Amino acid sequence: MPDGVNGDRTRTYSWDDPLELLSRTAGMSGIEALRLIAAGELPPPPIGMTLGFGPIEVEEGWATFTVEPAEFHYNPIGVVHGGLALALLDSAMGCAVHSTLAAGVAYTTLEVKANFVRPLTSSTGPIRCTRTVVHGGRTVATAEGRVVDADGKLYAHGTSTVLIFGD
């Protein structure tokens, strides 16, 4: 992939081994693991490091993630790519469900839908995504989320359906 026409912008980041994180959280409930990640006592998953987001608050059935939109999130039309808000929604909604799961139980996204209300830019400032479990079944759960700025202005909202599996 080309470095760009001018090559005057760079971004370097690192991440921890995701299998090590999985090993360290084995035997923990979802909420225990998520609270340790939110507190900085466990490293965030690589997707959080790549996009620059992570959990800041977690309670049973809901989670709040934050990210500050930056130039490296931009698409070719000069705004933040919708994939950032979608990834934020997917992660937050999934973690809201994860916060309700016992040790040894996992989930995977079956479907995620997002509605983008207005564009994000690097001048938007930090955004938050707050998600809540709507239905927590034995094998399927649903959640909803909202992406807002510091003033509560809505940028995107969505829903997610996840498959629950494991012990």
Residues covered by each model-derived region:
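Terminal targeting signals and extreme-terminal segments of soluble enzymes
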Residues: 1-167
